[in-house]
């Protein structure tokens, strides 16, 4: 019999509805798994009482015949989402002790759908990072290990590294993530799970701690494509409290899942064939093309000519918006306050921000402040916005020819913790395949598709038209079914 904690979101939901187990049994199993996996450092806080209370409510609802869409399912919540009555830190000392009095729209929707919360998941500080090494609460460790006998702890990706590590380790069935330049998709690829960033505006940003407001988007992370569709459906919807929220109906993504791609065209962007791409990544990409052809799709070569400018464009726009968003953290209203004896207001601001922000956050604030300064605004920020428009236009042109695009998700498998942290530019290059879709605001998903020579997961990315999450999910399902990815990390972390 399959252990409860090995079941994904759909398996738990359907098994609970069929009476195979109670919601309380589900909650107890996952609460125990979370408590026994401290070595992963995936959680900043654990909330077993929340998961248990939601489970007991689900059991009562089942007895009364009043089940909700996610009744019986406990989730992990990235600690970037405000949760009423539960600490929200964005993995930064700057928000130490901050307990929101309100609920983010996304978590409010999930809890209203019957889900419980197992805890708040670790992340890169203020979602800035690609390895989950910038958290003030310590590195998250991937549950995966190389098969060459080396025991170097591996990065789970970032910024949603707590989410990816916890799902891959089967200590949560699914989790929320956020994606600004790849923070759902790259961790998903590193840990052998599925993750989808929907169209910008599909999920409300209200109550999500802001990094770069024109790029930030909540999304779903789970074991597979179906689970991702279920979770994203529950998270999505118009919210008048978010001025960028899209007032469009939420489709029935799970009900309309289909791996039959007959009549669909899949684009292969030539600019993604970058120099020094590892042979294993290139081979998997070629295999993915054959899988989609086998599913009935026509393969078409396309061009996204401004792709090579995407990374520098992103690392101008995102820090610029971050420097503005993070100006609010000054020690006056909430969070950390560092008040040296005899200090005036300006000195308190300086001391608080110096103590509260980590090195990577400070680096991005400085970059952002520089490109927004009077002498450089037009040379950097204005020019980057123009290039962003060109990148979006490239996608528009491509989607006149094809329905979805297929690319690698990341330029490598997971790297060791500490391997790239000394060189910020090398770390930023991890986003090379994910950033373009973020700049264009289009939906994109990573699906686990194979293992490298050291036994580590590799992902393929599907990018779709605006609001065509269904097309992305369906292409992802076609790859998932043909890849047959069932690999799991060997359990070394449980007590």
Swiss-Prot record:
Q: Which GO terms describe its biological process?
A: translation
Catalytic activity from the UniProt record: L-glutamyl-tRNA(Gln) + L-glutamine + ATP + H2O = L-glutaminyl-tRNA(Gln) + L-glutamate + ADP + phosphate + H(+)
User: What Enzyme Commission number does this protein have?
Assistant: 6.3.5.7
Active site, per annotation:
78, 159, 183
The positions making up the signal sequence are none
Tell me a GO cellular component: glutamyl-tRNA(Gln) amidotransferase complex
Give the molecular function GO annotations: ATP binding; glutaminyl-tRNA synthase (glutamine-hydrolyzing) activity
Q: Which InterPro entries match?
A: Amidase, Amidase_CS, Amidase_dom, AS_sf, GatA
Provide this UniProt record's keywords sorted from A to Z: ATP-binding, Ligase, Nucleotide-binding, Protein biosynthesis
Q: Name one Pfam family in it.
A: Amidase
The superkingdom of the source organism is Bacteria
Q: Which NCBIfam families match?
A: gatA (TIGR00132)
Oligomeric state and partners? Heterotrimer of A, B and C subunits.
Q: Which family does it belong to?
A: Belongs to the amidase family. GatA subfamily.
Which purpose does this protein serve, as stated in its record?
Allows the formation of correctly charged Gln-tRNA(Gln) through the transamidation of misacylated Glu-tRNA(Gln) in organisms which lack glutaminyl-tRNA synthetase. The reaction takes place in the presence of glutamine and ATP through an activated gamma-phospho-Glu-tRNA(Gln).
Indicate what this protein is called per its UniProt record: Glutamyl-tRNA(Gln) amidotransferase subunit A
Organism, scientific name: Rhizorhabdus wittichii (strain DSM 6014 / CCUG 31198 / JCM 15750 / NBRC 105917 / EY 4224 / RW1)
